[in-house]
Regions:
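Extended, solvent-exposed polar beta/coil surface segments
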Residues: 1-230
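Asparagine-centered strand-capping/turn motif at beta-strand->loop junctions
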Residues: 16, 702-708, 804-808
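C-terminal beta-strand-rich structural cap/linker in extracellular carbohydrate-active enzymes
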Residues: 745-782
């Protein structure tokens, strides 16, 4: 407890002494002499220790006392108005002597609930049932206590007034001291409440031995009320805060059963809020979420589509802008200089799985990447990695969420960055400790409880589970980046190991089990999709198919369709309909689903219906619905302060159209995006709508509408595209229907994964681009790759020291590091040929370039090139701005 002089305004700062320990409650009291206010009404009660607290409307409080307090802390008295019917309680001195010095005072909300077989009260009533005004506070007049002083001549008392709707919560908790033999009146100015019809409970504890029910006999209670319009403000504010806080704790997993007391408390809070303020807008939003939106839609003010703007384009940009606002809120309001968002770094790493897809769509890419890098720095600063896995031992899913998910997500925005690639390499190398060939010869997860320091291998921990599979993310990415044979071995081996346990179910159908025991090969948990996380396994099977082209890996994909229909594959990021050759077979069912008019159609059928018909209204329906939901739930996803791994502003549909496939959604680990975007004008990302129907690796179409009043230029980068020479045909669609007019222009360019093309979008027009590969070149992932990046450059007084990494599939030829600025080349230094990192160990060489006075560090950059100008996996990691020393040139400065 801290005391300080009266002050107005200012800031309170709280510093925790234990890591990640939240503040529970803060109480602040203004303690001074004063008078009990008259209020708009008063109700007076007297404590009667000789009277039975037997009114039926006190039964819930009697149950609370019996359930929450040990037998020696259950002394109970009743406070009644003078004329109230009462029943004498029998004397039990032996029981009273065994009690601790705490007494509970019960005050009935009305006198109309006497116990059975008792005289009824006639022609009189007393209480606060259905009272219009609000409770301001309670004055307690304590009788003179004939008890010994225990602390400096006084008797300390603790007084708690319980919340009528949830007696486990205090409306006030205050400690005072009184002198023996001296009566005192204490005015407790509560936070105002519009009381429900529930009865009231106070608990008073004393430090003095002998304090019991008889000591409080004659205590006077005055309930002072104030006008409703004054009291309602604090009531509504407090109840809403309680709803917000309690829902924040329950939002991850909950029932709607009031047998779960945390939910029962939340239900009481939201009910009391809406009882007093039934039109409370945020309260209604919370109740809509709590009740699973079963009571109809909420009103949301939506903008109108401007004249002349295609509806699909307008609503896509509204949808995207809502996500941008949400992400910016989290970065600007929650991310601190340390790098984390305050939700626990392992939960924060789930949050930022939403960042890459948005950045790749062109929205604030540098801000979002910086946010992720800062969180990654916090992760490593906190020591959360050991030997490529989580430092802590934890379950199969949370071991991924300790930062492996974050490292994986960073590659999408830092393609080829050596630090990012080598961190993933370290994790894939560590997989051999947890993914092993079992006695039956199948590659399976050998443990579901592990970390980088210890792997638990007892029988209870040897079950491979569906949630084991998200952690394969680094292997999937490296298998795509440089066709790393170790990564591909793990992906295909896990898929084969699972397929080896396929069986015929009771219906005679092919099926996969839910869990597999590594040691014995036994299975449990029913079929794969009958438990949690079953769909997460599909990305491993899809990756195995894309790495090898072997049809056996599609059996689980078809198994999913047999169970859930083609919409069950909507979690696959790539255009699986064309990859599998199933568009003609499955699109009809999806279009039928999209055309349902009962509002039940999910998003993916609308996407396919647009692809098949060209009707952009299907897209407009998706985006308008998403924009509406994001506006409705914005408060809960931001200022509602849910766990950071529970908030979401979905972008799967935005990514599928703008990127030609989904780059990343949490636990959807095989990248499927065709392209990404970076706009010269940072605001253009939310001004240019883009849709890419039915993309394939060797051809795709881009439909875009620029809603701004000026031309916009964007850099379009290839990802899931075949390398080679491409023909681009670009023109406008005068009818805004996505169909290319006849006066189009054609050009041919080299295009491949991570290569970029500049595209111009004229203002107020629909632009159509048709891209088709006309000549192939060497597969990107099979090439050598040299790179420099984070932490690879040190500037000293007279030199620049550079670490060059070999990151490719093939050995890298010899080359040079060149120092240059706007004037051209300033220095160069050679390095030898480097082997490929086939054993997942970093392969590097050190290069030193002289630093002369002619170098202007602010404009200088480093460039890596090979002697033969050999094509590499990517050129994105071949250039790096030169860091400016933060200290005098005599000291070294690491980037």
């Amino acid at each position: 407890m801290d005391q300080f002089p009266e002050r107005r305004g200012g800031t309170l700062r709280f510093a925790n002494t234990a890591q990640e320990t939240p503040i529970q409650e803060i109480w602040a009291y203004d303690v001074q002499p004063g008078q009990v206010p008259n209020g708009s009404a008063q109700l007076s009660y007297t404590v009667r220790s000789d009277i039975q607290p037997d009114y039926d409307n006190l039964a819930p409080l009697r149950a609370v006392i019996a359930g929450r307090y040990p037998s020696g802390e259950r002394q109970t008295v009743i406070a009644l108005p003078t004329k109230a019917p009462a029943r004498k309680r029998p004397s039990d001195k032996a029981a009273a002597s065994a009690q601790q010095p705490i007494v509970h005072i019960l005050v009935p909300s009305s006198l109309g609930d006497p116990p059975p077989d008792q005289a009824l009260m006639r022609s009189w009533s007393y209480g606060w049932e259905n009272m219009h005004d609000g409770l301001d506070g309670i004055a307690i007049t304590l009788p003179a206590l004939n008890l010994p002083a225990t602390h400096n001549g006084s008797i300390p008392l603790n007084i708690r007034i319980k919340d009528p709707i949830w007696p486990a919560r205090d409306m006030i908790d205050v400690s005072v001291a009184v002198a023996p033999g001296q009566a005192r009146t204490l005015w407790l100015d509560l936070r105002d409440r519009i009381l429900s019809n529930d009865s009231l409970m106070l608990s008073i504890a004393a430090a003095a031995p002998g304090f019991d029910a008889n000591a409080l006999d004659g205590t006077q209670l005055q309930l002072v009320f104030k006008p409703r319009n004054e009291a309602i403000k604090e009531h509504v504010a407090d109840r809403f805060n309680q709803v917000k806080d309690n829902w924040g704790f329950l939002v991850e997993e909950h029932t709607t059963s009031k047998r779960q007391l945390l939910y029962k408390r939340l239900d009481a809070d939201i009910t009391d809020l809406l009882r007093v303020d039934p039109d409370h807008a945020l309260g209604r939003e919370y109740w809509n979420d709590i009740s699973y939106a079963n009571q109809g839609t909420l009103p949301v003010e939506m903008p109108s589509v401007p004249k002349g703007v295609p509806a699909w384009a307008f609503w896509q940009l509204q949808d995207l802008s809502a996500t941008r606002r949400y992400i910016r809120w989290w970065i600007e309001q929650r991310q601190v200089a340390y790098g984390d968002f305050g939700g626990g770094i392992s939960d924060d790493s789930d949050l930022v799985q939403q960042w890459p897809g948005v950045a790749l769509m062109g929205v604030d890419p540098d801000m979002l990447n910086a946010s992720m890098l800062a969180l990654s720095d916090a992760n490593y600063r906190n020591g959360m990695f050991t030997n490529g896995l989580s430092t802590i031992e934890t379950d199969e899913l949370h071991s991924y969420e300790e930062g492996i998910n974050l490292n994986s997500a960073l590659l999408y925005l830092n393609w080829g960055d050596p630090r990012t690639v080598e961190r993933l390499m370290e994790t894939v190398k560590a997989f051999d400790n947890i993914i092993q060939v079992n006695p039956q010869g199948h590659l399976l997860f050998a443990s579901n409880w592990f970390g980088g320091r210890k792997v638990y291998r007892e029988p209870n921990w040897q079950w491979q589970k569906p949630y084991s599979f998200p952690i394969v993310h680094p292997a999937i990415l490296l298998g795509g980046y440089n066709a790393d044979p170790n990564s591909r071995r793990i992906v295909t081996g896990l898929a084969d190991g699972y397929l080896a346990h396929a069986y015929t179910n009771a219906k005679g159908n092919w099926a996969l089990p839910n869990e597999i025991n590594w040691q014995t090969g036994k299975t449990r948990g029913g079929e794969l999709f009958e438990g949690s996380g079953g769909a997460d396994t599909l990305h491993t099977f899809w990756a195995a198919y894309r790495f090898t082209g072997e049809d056996r890996y599609l059996k689980p994909i078809n198994y999913r369709v047999a169970n859930s229909g083609p919409n069950g594959l909507s979690l696959l990021n790539e255009n699986f309909l064309d990859v599998m050759g199933k568009r003609s077979d499955w699109s009809g069912k999806l279009i039928d689903a999209a055309n349902k008019d009962d509002g039940s159609a999910p998003d993916f059928p609308h996407h396919v219906a647009w692809e098949q018909t060209g009707n952009l209204d299907y897209l407009a329906a998706i985006y308008r619905s998403e924009a509406r939901e994001k506006l409705q739930n914005f408060y809960m996803n931001t200022e509602g302060h849910w766990w950071s791994d529970r908030v979401e502003s979905p972008t799967v549909n935005l990514q599928r159209e703008r990127l030609g496939g989904v780059a990343l959604k949490r636990n959807q680990t095989y990248p499927g995006h065709t392209v990404s975007w970076r706009f010269n004008d940072p605001e253009a990302a939310t001004q240019v709508a883009i849709a890419i129907p039915a993309p394939q690796q060797d051809r795709f179409t881009v439909i875009a509408y620029n809603t701004s009043n000026k031309n916009q230029r964007a850099s379009m980068t290839g990802w899931n595209v075949a390398p080679g020479q491409w023909r681009i045909t670009q023109g406008v669609s005068k009818g805004n229907d996505g169909k290319l007019d006849s006066n189009a222009k054609t050009q041919e360019v080299a295009f491949e994964k991570s290569a970029s093309i500049d595209i111009d979008f004229p203002a107020g027009r629909t632009t159509v681009l048709q891209l088709e590969r006309i000549a192939a070149t060497t597969p990107v992932e099979l090439r050598p790759d040299l790179g420099i990046g984070h932490g690879d450059v040190r500037v000293t007084a007279d030199a620049i020291e550079v670490t060059v990494h070999s990151l490719g599939h093939a050995d890298a030829p010899a080359g040079f590091v060149v120092l240059e600025d706007t004037r051209g080349e300033l220095a160069r230094s050679a390095f030898p040929a480097l082997a490929a990192p086939r054993n997942l160990q970093p392969i590097t060489t050190q290069v030193r370039l002289p630093l002369t006075n002619a170098v202007t560090l602010k404009t200088a950059r480093l460039r890596v090139l090979t002697e033969s100008n050999a094509p590499e996996i990517t050129d994105l990691n071949n250039k790096l701005a030169l860091p400016t020393p933060a200290k005098p040139a005599t000291a070294k400065n690491s980037q």
